[in-house]
Amino acid sequence: MAKYRAGRINEEVKKAISSIIQNDIRDPRLTSMISVIKVDVTKDLRYAKAYVSILGDEAKKKETMDILKKSESFIRKELGYAVKLRYTPEVIIELDTSIEKGMHIDAILEKIKGSDKNDNR
């Protein structure tokens, strides 16, 4: 039962943080596409670690992460309005690079698959 509740809370907080980032942060420098991949809320509901994926080059990712880090307190305040919990968790934004790593591995596998076809001929 506890795992089910934790999963529901994680999903609800994820939806709320995603909505806040997309709709409520009014910074003209936020032009990259930002996706909230996963949110882990601690058992005591004090902290929420949000993993985000940012589309763009490294400089744009760094700039976007700096903006999001500075907006953590605003996101927490808005999260308190959006999700009714005993405590409003402190939001910690982390960059998730798993999608880029997966794409890199796929490219390597395709390259290997292509070289195997050429070797068999």
Curated annotation (Swiss-Prot):
Keyword terms of this UniProt record: Cytoplasm, Ribosome biogenesis
UniProt feature coiled coil, ranges: none
A biological process term (GO) from this entry: maturation of SSU-rRNA
Subunit structure: Monomer. Binds 30S ribosomal subunits, but not 50S ribosomal subunits or 70S ribosomes.
Record's function text: One of several proteins that assist in the late maturation steps of the functional core of the 30S ribosomal subunit. Associates with free 30S ribosomal subunits (but not with 30S subunits that are part of 70S ribosomes or polysomes). Required for efficient processing of 16S rRNA. May interact with the 5'-terminal helix region of 16S rRNA.
Record's keyword annotation contains Cytoplasm: yes
Name the record gives this protein: Ribosome-binding factor A
GO cellular component terms given for this protein: cytosol
Protein localization: Cytoplasm
Protein family membership: Belongs to the RbfA family.
Keyword Amino-acid biosynthesis: no
Domain of life where this protein originates: Bacteria
Species per Swiss-Prot/TrEMBL record: Clostridium acetobutylicum (strain ATCC 824 / DSM 792 / JCM 1419 / IAM 19013 / LMG 5710 / NBRC 13948 / NRRL B-527 / VKM B-1787 / 2291 / W)
GO molecular function terms noted in the UniProt entry: ribosomal small subunit binding
